[in-house]
A protein has these predicted regions:
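Short S/T/G/P-rich N-terminal loop/turn motif that feeds into the first structured element of a domain
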Residues: 2-40, 45, 51-56, 96-113
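Short, flexible active-site loop motifs that bind/organize anionic cofactors or intermediates
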Residues: 1, 61, 88
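A short pocket-lining beta-strand/turn micro-motif at the edge of beta-sheets
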Residues: 57-59, 85
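An amphipathic, aromatic/His-enriched active-site/gating alpha helix that lines ligand/cofactor pockets
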Residues: 64-95
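A structural preference for short, hydrophobic beta-strand core positions in alpha/beta folds
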Residues: 48-49, 89
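Short hydrophobic/aromatic beta-strand micro-patches
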Residues: 14, 60-64
Length: 113
């Protein structure tokens, strides 16, 4: 995978009953447009938005954000609409980023520290 310039997050969202009713009245793409605009307003970029087959969460969304605070602010905005009752925001790390982090580690036992 190529290098990323912004942190990537997975957001798992659960709709409220009212939020689900709104989805039935308007096209789901209206909600998607809202999410994209909110994320882009803080300098982020949506990578994917999916409905899930999970009973716990209805939406799985991946997006890049300038930082974790911006990601949290967008999720807070979504919750403030009353459409989202529960969320889980997870920062994603690529395998190459982990390899780079592991390479930078110093073993305190081996180094005598």
């Amino acid at each position: 995978m190529g290098e990323r310039h912004m942190p990537r997050f997975l957001a798992l969202l659960q709709y409220t009953t009212e939020g689900s009713k709104v989805l039935l009245k308007e096209k789901v793409t209206v909600r998607e447009t809202f999410a994209r605009k909110a994320i882009e307003s803080v300098g982020g970029k949506v990578e994917s938005i999916y409905f899930t087959a999970s009973g716990e969460y209805h939406i799985a969304m991946t997006a890049e954000y300038p930082d974790a605070a911006m990601a949290a602010a967008v999720i807070a905005l979504m919750v403030s609409t009353g459409a989202v009752s529960k969320f889980n925001l997870i920062e994603l790390i690529t395998t190459s980023e982990i390899d780079r982090a592991y390479a930078a580690l110093t073993d305190p036992v081996a180094s005598g520290s």
